[in-house]
């Protein structure tokens, strides 16, 4: 019997790949949240205590504030901080010596589980991390699979269909982590969440539950962050640190209409009008890399390295929060 072979041209494979990607994006939130929902929104939180690094992750029973740093989308675990991020953390620890500074929360996991261990796909993520750390262009491009995966979690946090469940899980991770360092939920101290880039959405989503469910006084510092306004209104105050040459921030802002100041009913506009948001101009700083907020080689017109200027601006806000929250007690 004669058979006919139907030729499969390039369009077939292109549309097939597009459909596969679309279906993958559609079911990914369900795969991510399914185990969490089946467990009654209470699952085992992965704990991996990391030894103190200088004054970072150093328990302090007399600390008058807790500062939690959430990293950008390139992170795969609580252990993989970039040198630039480590640099600003050490500077903040020196400038805010009376605060407990923490950085070992993996913001892109609903149970704090790192990508590179205790997962079925851990070998793939370890391979992707190795590729990302290589200097050759084609290798590092493959490593950006990590960024894509973490961006999907940012989108889940911002999606109203999944946000309530996902963000509540992130809030549980944060409170569990704080208690490991002596934070008393019954007598809460100021919690300052410092977010970089995409982690801003994770922080914004968790704020609602940290405030409503745990009654914590939460302050948020956004370093060139992408986030929606939903939930952030529960924060006591929000500071945005933005450079004039940060085009990545401005591009992503286009996809967050809840933060546009033009609509009359914009939540972000109402928060701004109420004096609960502050924008701090960081000068001619870019989003990342050379000339970025954490660059130690580029300097301000006054001759201060960008990373030092960023750390000082953040430390000024953190120390102001500490002083303002102590004043009523002393009175």
Predicted regions and their residues:
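Active-site catalytic motif of lipid deacylating hydrolases and related acyltransferases
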Residues: 17-20, 27, 33-47, 68-187, ...
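Short coil/turn segments at beta-strand junctions that form active-site/ligand-binding loops
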Residues: 63-65, 99, 187-190, 216, ...
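Gly/Ala-rich beta-loop-alpha elbow adjacent to hydrolase catalytic centers
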Residues: 194-199, 203
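Lipolytic serine-hydrolase domain surface
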Residues: 234-329
């Amino acid at each position: 019997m004669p058979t006919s072979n139907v030729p499969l041209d390039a369009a077939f494979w292109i549309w097939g790949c597009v459909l596969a990607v679309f279906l993958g994006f559609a079911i990914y939130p369900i795969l991510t949240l399914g185990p969490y929902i089946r467990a009654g929104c209470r699952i085992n939180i992965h704990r991996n205590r990391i030894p103190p690094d200088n004054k970072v992750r150093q328990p302090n029973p007399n600390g008058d504030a807790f500062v939690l740093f959430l990293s950008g989308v390139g992170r795969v675990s609580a252990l993989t901080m970039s040198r630039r991020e480590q640099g600003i953390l050490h500077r903040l620890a020196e400038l805010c010596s009376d605060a407990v500074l923490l950085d070992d929360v993996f913001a892109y996991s609903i149970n704090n589980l790192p990508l590179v261990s205790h997962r079925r796909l851990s070998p793939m993520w370890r391979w992707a991390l190795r590729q990302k750390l290589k200097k050759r262009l084609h290798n590092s491009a493959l490593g950006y699979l990590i960024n894509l995966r973490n961006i999907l979690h940012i989108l889940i946090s911002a999606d109203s269909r999944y946000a309530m469940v996902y963000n509540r899980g992130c809030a549980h991770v944060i409170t569990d982590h704080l208690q490991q360092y002596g934070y008393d939920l019954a007598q809460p101290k100021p919690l300052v969440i410092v977010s970089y880039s995409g982690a801003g959405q994770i922080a914004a989503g968790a704020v609602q539950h940290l405030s409503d469910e745990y009654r914590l006084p939460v302050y948020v510092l956004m370093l060139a962050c992408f986030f929606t306004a939903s939930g952030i209104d529960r924060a006591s105050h929000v500071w945005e640190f933005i450079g004039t040459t940060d085009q990545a921030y401005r591009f992503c802002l286009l996809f967050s209409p809840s933060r546009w100041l033009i609509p009359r009913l914009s939540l972000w506009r109402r928060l701004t009008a109420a004096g609960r948001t502050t924008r701090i101009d960081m000068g001619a700083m870019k989003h990342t890399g050379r000339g970025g907020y954490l660059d130690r080689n580029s300097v301000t017109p006054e001759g201060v390295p960008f990373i030092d200027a960023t750390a000082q601006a953040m430390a000024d806000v953190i120390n102001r929060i500490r002083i303002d929250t102590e004043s009523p007690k002393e009175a």
